[in-house]
Amino acid sequence: LRNWNQIRPGVFDGGYAFDSYIPGGWDSGGTETSGLPAATYVVETAVPAGYKLVKEEDKNVDFGQEYEVMRTDPLLNVPVCVGDMHTVPNQLSLFPGVASRYAGEQRPLCDMKQVKLEDGRNAPADFFLFTEAPVAANVRGFITDDLDNEGNPQAPTFGEKYAPPWLPVSFHDYTGREIARVYSDEFGSYNAMLPPPFTNNIGSPSGVSPQMYEVCINSPYMTDPASGNLIKDPNFDPQYSNTCLVFQFMPGATTYLDTPIIPKAANAGRGQFPTDCEFPHHTPVIQKVDSADGGPYVAKPVGGGKEIMIYSAGTVEVPNPYYEGPGSSNPKTTFRDHGFGAAQGVVTLDGDKLKILEWSADMIRAEVASKHRTGQLMVERGDNGRQGLLGITVHVGASGSVHHVANGESIQDAIDNAAAGDLILVEPGDYRELLIVYKDVILQGYGRGAIINGIKSPKEILGQWRTKVDKLFAQGEFDLLPGQQNRPDVFGEYRLFANEEGPAVLVVNKENTPFQNARIDGFTISGADAGGGIFVNGYGENLTISNNRIINNQGNFSGAVRLGHPTLTNQNGYVDAMNDNVFISHNQIIQNGGLDGSGGGVSICTGADDYKIADNFICGNFSAGYGGGIGHRGLSDGGEIVRNWILFNKNFNQGSSVNGGGVSLLGAPPLPGDVLSPGTGSVTIGSNLIQGNLAGAGRGGGISLDQVNGQELGQNKYQVQLFNNLVVNNIAGASGGGVSIADAVDVRIINNTFYSNDSTGTSMESFVAGPLKSTPQISGLAYHRPQNQVLAAMGETPPQNPVTLDNPVLVNNIFHNNRSFYWDSATGPTGGLIPDIDGGEAPVFSDLGLVNYPQGSMLDPRYCYLTDATGYHASNIGGDPVVMDDYFNGARDWVIELGGNIVGQPAIDEGGNFIDVHFGPLTLTGNYHLAGSSGAINAGTNDYLSVFSFLKKDIDSQKRPNGNKSDIGADEYYAGANPDPGPTPDPAPQPDGGGGFPGGGGGGGGGCFINELVADRY
């Protein structure tokens, strides 16, 4: 009850006692005397406001078993009612029409009871009161983000976990019916009153049964009070999980709830300066493609061509990255032009230009001729030359039957009715179903308006999915992987896909039957939990996942797309999932989250040889494991990660060190009996923009390589190639703000730009000497000495003297302005980062370095541009390489200034990774293409062009070299060739970042110059 731990001058828990009296009564003026003499007394209760005295007609439950009135022993001296007489009415007071017992009789009220007190006996007299409405159960709750800290001194949780404000909280009964909906306040607190149970007289001290309700935090859907339809709650925050827990509630008691939630997205929770993961202003975005044959499909043209209609997304409302919070002069949302522009541009199908019949900002009519074939449709604006990453596949003819799914119909029914090779066309609409793709079919949406909604509401959706999965497996429609049968979930329950239940799209297949046609294309996929957006279990060879907007999904091991299993083993070791040759292309993968494993956005697990992740926009994803944006875990040889935008992703875990804010390559740990990891296989990471990613609890803000090599050593060496990447403005809590390398012994790093990356020295592995002061870490590129077991497998011994390493190969790279900080608890009231730039201290730059090597050991870059080339080979250049527009990381509000401190706020009473870094800008800014005055132009070497054909083009797919020698860095300078128009302002009065998409044209100017990094150690 609410009055525990209190002293009150009155009734406590309804109990009372008399141990004295005044002879002659209160008005006699007598003296109070201790002890009560044996006598007959009358005890009266005063009924408080809001309560009523229980009378014969006040029976409140008229169902259940009937009980006979117990005959009492006269020796018990049961007190009798002696109040005023009243007439019992004919009907029950709470149930009109139900006859009262003793109807019409005169009965005494029970507010006064006659008590016969005898020597040596107790004489209790209980009084029974009620309210017409049963006494409510009271709730007081608190929402916290367990992966973020509060740095606002005005907040009640300052120095503790961050409390997300204004989230919807829904209470459901066992049928799933919503009982109440409330909202948290600005500090994450909420309260509610809930109906109590009807069950009484059970075998418990109170006699009252608890009522069980499910509490759903950040509940996405509510009933529209006007229409009665289910609508999205306007306070639902898609950056956070929808977490449901069951609690018990008692009438009249207050239940205190601690209800944490987990972010789906990187940098979630802060209403101000939100992460900008929408396409830039004036970028063409396809909303829908249609034709007379239905959707992005035309029957094979014979003779003349066939028309298709391409509709743009038009003007789109998006979160404003310049919104400062309540009271901001900038609006919370802004509008961006995602139309096609008034000036005619270009439409290509599989690289061939289509004839334009009509062009407007909203719609294009184009002709598909008989020469054209099925392929990728892309639109390029005529006014600025921009081409978006998100296109759509247009099918010219079909090898099988064509199925059409209209809005309101079932996609799963179409899959069930299709045969291998069939094309399933899905119209725009909100399809709230969890799909199981178990056939070799093409699942084709009309565009991002066709939404596969993975939210499991109502609860029957998950039940139907379980039934469907069990039925398909029992019928032999798909096979499980070795060792997958009878695996329990985290609660010990055995069922199929226990740890990844209900992804929005589950892909399964039979063993030894590789897909020939399977494709998932042209959808928005959102709202999933546990299983994530798309989960490919196994035997998914040759699957294509393309042109989808995959947003706000969460999974136990990955948020958006996952291939295979990170930890599945059998007696032979890690299980090969047989997901080879999967192609993940032209998707917008934004603000998804994974709780474990690797890859908040995309997760590649053991057995995905020759996968390709190309031309995707991967932004704002979060992982509590490795790899905020992309995670490759286990052995998958021959993978490619190319031409992607990997922006503002994050990984963080308070309890352990996790690496790779943008991209992580991680070999699976050795199994019992093994000494070395199986490794990762060889992987190429090329022509990516890797910007603004954060490894808050470990190494490798942009890229981390861990346990790449292992069991293959002595016979072979897996090789990692880093070519043509712009790795800029990333942050690591430990070493390697740009890239961290550990147990990777054959790495080729050629023609990359590592610029303005930071190491904050705030992760727990940086606190070598204790929690008061950390050790500064290497920022640009950090190479860690391989484990002794790896060296032994290579036939080498640990280095004893200073060495100059020929691994990794470092050629034609820019390393500039990569800063190193460390934490000092003596700085400011709660500690801070050093150097103190605001206090006049100069930044410390740390471009390259070795970890755990003898003092004096060095890497051996050649033809590289370094902040300081002192001590390196003569082919290197020191100084400023001069790019179009660079900037330093800054505060979340990224005030433009020439210098500034990194500011941090700890979770004061916690250990592990107790410092959480917050920074900005979190919108596209800067342009790291070479300026015309750059000393990097024609300063490189051509030695590797004949070895690696990938290097014959730069990050913009322009020919290298442009002249006699290659330029240093990812960009090959072309004066005036295909210049990007630079940043285009939003309708709100702020700039929107510049630079073209990788593969879409050369350098251009624009952006802001920001020099302050704020590590809000919240």
Residue ranges: model-predicted function:
Residues V379-D383, A891-F997, G1006-N1011:
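Surface beta-loop-beta hairpin patches that serve as ligand-binding interfaces in beta-rich domains
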Residues G269-A343, L357, N384-D413:
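Beta-strand/beta-sandwich contexts
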Residues L1-T31, T157-S204, I356-L357:
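Short, acidic Ser/Thr/Gly-rich low-complexity loop/linker segments typical of extracellular
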Residues Q516-G527, E541-Q554, L568-G593, A608-F622, ...:
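Right-handed parallel beta-helix
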Residues G400-R432, S934, D956, P961:
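Acidic Gly/Asp/Thr-rich repetitive segments characteristic of extracellular carbohydrate-active
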